[in-house]
Amino acid sequence: KAYIYPEYLPERDRDTTMFNTIEYYDKLLTEANFPHIEMTKWFKTMKDTLPYPIFPTMDNHWQFTSVYAYDSLFRFMDNLKHFGIPKIKYGEPQAYDLKFQSDEATLNLLFPVRDKSTDYKLDVEIECNDSCRKPQVLFVGDSFIWALNEQLPWEKLMEDIEIWFYNSDVYKGFDRKPYKKDDINMLRDMLKADYIVFYTSGHLWHRATYDFVEQALLTLCVSDSLMEVESIRIADSLGISKEEAIAKIKDYPGMIRGIMNCDNPSIRNE
């Protein structure tokens, strides 16, 4: 929200640096030819043309405008694999008044806010003909995912869903059954997904992917036997213990020889 409406920030919180994490990662991903969408610039343009607010005044998260984002995302995903994902259709936003907006609860106020902002809702339909297919999707990211459930009939859009919330807590299925990350089979869950979508909002880019990329590389490309050999080699070369070497590998998987040239990430399935 602060990236879309920086003009509402107090002067002390204005970004005066020359470094923009969104532009930085967008440039790197583009240079690597990695499929991604950078939506901040879209919404910054939309805020001057839409007759509605991109974000509600009383909420940190997007609401009806998330439908535009998810429509773009699923179209983008479909173009990558020509999967046949169902189409998202929506009309004009309809205004309604919220009696209590979710993020008001986080302010710890003695009295509720009197002048609440008007929010909007989209009537959303999912179109699926005989040739369409609903994908299984694994999402890894922050709390902006919950609008997918609140604003769209996600059971009509996807066959199944799994959410790795901040790459820590896991929610499986449309009923969001909770698991701890350590209790799931990470390799199996990644391989059964038709799509893996990592997403984040601007103010969290300093945490990059919440270690998801590092864990995915090790899970997909490094067998237990290779980890054993490489941890011993690195421990000997650095004069540290094997346990310390494993910790370093988890932070920097590129220390393992050949992992960055892993064109076929199925070594763990041998």
Which residue stretches match the model-derived regions?
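Extracellular glycan-modifying ectodomains
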Residues: K1-E270
